[in-house]
């Protein structure tokens, strides 16, 4: 199991980024959370198999239709054993 924290910058709020991330994570058995930040970015934590988490990072780099991703920060973290994916 691996865990990555991503912060996505660009036009990423108001384009269903969080909901699409939640649905995509659910289809890949990835746990964690996603939230809007006050600075206009979207932040997420993904936990799961290396392959599934890498797929989520690739998704974050593209975003849903309507998003304009400019930059993505990715940081490895220690897994915490999360059991669900939530939008906060």
Q: Language-model segments: which ranges?
A:
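Intrinsically disordered, low-complexity, mixed-charge
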Residues: 1-88
């Amino acid at each position: 199991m691996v865990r990555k924290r991503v912060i996505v910058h660009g036009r990423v709020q108001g384009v269903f980024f969080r909901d699409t991330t939640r649905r995509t994570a659910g289809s890949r058995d990835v746990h964690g959370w996603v939230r809007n930040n006050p600075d206009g970015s979207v932040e997420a934590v993904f936990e799961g198999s290396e392959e599934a988490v890498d797929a989520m990072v690739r998704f974050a780099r593209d975003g849903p239709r309507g998003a304009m991703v400019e930059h993505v920060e990715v940081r490895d973290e220690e897994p915490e054993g999360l059991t669900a994916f939530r939008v906060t």
